[in-house]
Amino acid sequence: MKKYIAYAILSGLLLTAGWPSHGFPLLLFIGFVPLMLTEHQITQRAEFKKKGSKIFGLSFLAFFIWNAIVIWWLHYAQETDANGDLHNSWSAYLIPVVANSLFMSIVFQLYHFVKTKAGNLYGLVFLPAIWMSFDKLTLNWELTWPWFNLGNGFAKYYEWVQWYEYTGTFGGALWIWLVNITVFYYLTAYINKKEMRYLNKLGIYAGLLIAVPIGISYIIYANYEEKGKALDVLVLQPDLDPYNEKYMKDGLQIYEELKQLALKNIQPKTQFVVAPETAVPGSSALIFDNMYDDLIIQDIQQWTKTKKDLHFVTGASIMRIYPMQSLASETASVMRDGITWYDAYNSALQISGNDSIEVYHKSKLVPGVEIFPYRNILMPIIGEFMLNFGGTTKTLGIQPHRSVFKNKTNNATVAPVICYESIYGDYTTEYVREGANVIFTMTNDSWWGSTDGHRQLLLYGNLRAIENRRAIVRSANSGISAFVNQRGDIMKSLPYGEQGALNGTILMNSELTFYTKYGDVIARIALLVMGIILAYTLAQKLLYKQNKKKI
């Protein structure tokens, strides 16, 4: 059993060592192999009892190691204790680590079930299918946590996956699984002392499986020419401490400092100024129905008027008031007076002196922070627990469809992507299908300090440039703010933890990629294959039981 524990630990460490931002993704091609060998050998050993429990425990160990190390930075989020002092939030770290490890272990357990009942071939087809189905689930349910979607593993080595414009990140996930399964076949054949000719064929096949997609990608990368007209943008990075400054400092003072940062760096050709997530109005919120009367909004309209073709795009905190519950939305909460209801939004605004204000509400929300998942079901069960550990029992308002920012003075159609939304591939294509020819990402990654958190989010988000062939302008509160071209290259950036501004020029592409048009085709096929094989396996088991009863 010690050997299998070592195998599980090895799998966890290989997956970790292959993951961004410091890992080398070649290791992802063998990361699952030790765990697959463990499952295979335990299944074959007659002396082992409770094989399913052993495999579940070992897979949990592997996935726990992977999750725990990769998102170690999460515990640097701060929460307030009973005395009002800030300290590291271990609950914000342990809950996703344990939950995601558990979900992954259940997926692997289902693979073991199918492989045992339906045979090796069905099992090895089922494994990538159910894993990608789980990855798709993590993108769409309220417990959404797609940080470990396998295709993200190539985010730093994006030159390897330029074909994401056809497949999205699920192409990367399928690639990883095909190589892992081939290497698994090779090792089992070697252990079973198969002919050298057979082993050589498998080895060559595994090598080609890795080399050919990388070669194709580099050809695409070298030959891709950016498309579209030029757009000149100024990015702001105010670098406000989210715990001791951003929500404690006077909102007008925060805005004035942001304004001065913009005015000092605007150039004659600047067409857009982009500020980060919730940059205005500071520590309070704009009232949705009275936005045009807000002093900050009016001032922005005044200084953007000084230049004909100037637009200010920023993240904003917005509140919508409902005088009675009958008018409130499903996500609304009641104020302390017990009468007035309101929705809070994490939003983006486009403001200029010549156009009406464009508004977009963030709609992929962070579980436990911006949304209480499945509130009607879980609130009575764990509501108090969430409050005690610094979470929320409320949910921010959202909008049902993606919308884009247009203007009257240039051809830019902006996809306003807010923070967490930037890691959702199929979701981002909705903006582009609405006409977006450039992506503006507004984010505040300061909650975890100078850790891998903000670097991983930057790298994941840059994959959207490849999938849609859209340039990205990224404004982050403390960094990393950047300009990313249509190939996924970071052209310019501001380091983390520095206040500053960055001028850059991007191109506005209006052509649609295959992935933009059709989305996660591979994931949909995986769902179908998973469903068919699982149904077949259950039917086989049922028939076996019925035949056994007859005997």
Give residue spans per PLM region:
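Membrane-embedded alpha-helical bundles of multi-pass enzymes
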Residues: M1-Y221, S450, G461-R464, A476, ...
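Conserved hydrophobic/aromatic beta-strand scaffold that supports enzyme active sites
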Residues: T16-W19, Q109, V235, A348-Q350, ...
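A generic fold-level signal
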Residues: S21, Y158, G228, K307, ...
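Short, conserved active-site loops that position catalytic residues or coordinate cofactors/metal ions
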Residues: S21-M36, W66-A77, Q237-P238, K269-I287, ...
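Active-site catalytic loop in hydrolytic enzyme cores
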Residues: W73-I95, A118, L137-T169, S333-Y420, ...
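CN hydrolase (nitrilase-like) catalytic-core segments centered on the catalytic cysteine
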Residues: N100, P128-A129, F272, T278-V280, ...
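Soluble catalytic regions of membrane-associated enzymes that act on cell-envelope
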Residues: Y218-I371, V404-N411, P416, Y420
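Amphipathic beta-strand/beta-sheet edge segments enriched in Tyr/Trp
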Residues: G338-K362, I480-Y496, G500-I506
